[in-house]
Amino acid sequence: MRTYPRGVNGKEATAYLRRHLPWLALPLAPAQGLWVTRRVPRLAEAEGRTGVVGSGERRLKVVAFGDSVTAGYAVAHHRESVAGALAARLANRYAAQVSWAVCAQSGATADVALGLVDPAVLADADLIFVSIGVNDAKNGHSTARFRRDVGVLFDAILAAAPRAQVCLLGVPPLEHFPALPRPLADVMGWRGRVFDAIGKQEVAARPRMLRIEADGPLGPEMFAEDGFHPSVTLHAAFADAVMEQLDLRPPLS
């Protein structure tokens, strides 16, 4: 059965299908999503939600905030997650004692994450790393809802952490995740790009916020055994990307 307009050649047909595949695949997405949920192994969040590295008179604090990425899902200990990796890099760069804290929950969407904003934890933070948006895209939230929810969340974080630089992790290219079969991967990739663009716009509209891309090469070594969450290698890459951004901004206080 023809699924593209008559009168187009093979190359044009391929381009047409790539543009329209997410819409064509939407009816299959719920069934495939259920299959993935049953198939993907359940793993644990990392231990060590607080910790300290480095030495020196200077004191810095990094907070990992948001969803399963920052909760360290599929990582043994937060020493190896983005929280610990950032703390170690900050300690080395600034010859400081750096503490980390984690305010994150697996499965959190932007509205759920609002309940994780804890002024007692965030008030003295120097750097806050935020991962949010994948679950909003996965759970079928509308773009208008996500824009509203993530804007409210960013404002709450900035208010609770008056001196912190806040870094958002971009929504990764979900179409490349090993755990997602096609056409579900194409649907998720399409939604992920839309939600990523919203996050980018909301970051640009606020002071003290920056963002790192999550669209680098994603080989098998970048994923945990579930094929969905980041491995220790990818957590380290996130931390390296943040440190590159910090090179371009005023030194942490």
Task: State what each model feature region is.
Residues 30-43, 60-67, 97-108, 145-154, ...:
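Short charge-dense sequence patches
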Residues 61-63, 69-149:
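Conserved SGNH/GDSL esterase-like catalytic core that processes O-acyl groups on lipids
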Residues 2-13, 112-116, 135, 174:
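Extracellular glycan-modifying ectodomains
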